[in-house]
Amino acid sequence: WHAATVVTQIECDPDDPAFKNPTKPIGPFYTEEQAKEFMAEDPSKVFVEDSGRGWRRVVASPDPKKIVEADSILNLLDNEFIVIACGGGGIPVVRDYENKGCYKGVPAVIDKDLGGELLAEDCDADVLFLLTAVEHVAINFGKPNQEELEDLTADEAERLADEGQFGKGSMEPKVRAAIKFARSRKGRTCIIGALDKAAETMA
């Protein structure tokens, strides 16, 4: 077996409502004065105050619709390559129909869990592993009544996510990706576990 890394473009819908509500912080921190100066120079750029640490630019996080290089990835797998793809979620692109339908990059961030879920679907995987810093998904995380969850149906997971039981920028995206994968085809399972116990998780 050989390993290959594929720089991956992810097609998004240019009309995704996320583009009107940028939420993903990127780049360095700035002072309020600097941030307002940047926004005055280019009104398309949005900066917000970030947890008392300064101001950062925020961009959209649209839903991934298609992996542009999916055929290349599958061809590599068929030829016994270990493929590294969708790094960081992938590069967000949209169709530019004013330029023969070519792809063009957009200022956005693809959620890496949803990007990985789409890749798992394209590879016709039966199981998706999402590895993180904790061993279990939990409700009431970090509280005295924290409860670690072992097995959930997609409906149960969705109910808990809708109740706000999971961290918005940490566990909730993983749970949402797990739900999407489990519902994409009968018999599919997603396992969320600790990176340092990946071998045990996959056993």
Range-by-range predicted roles:
Residues 1-203:
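C-terminal catalytic "cap/lid" subdomain
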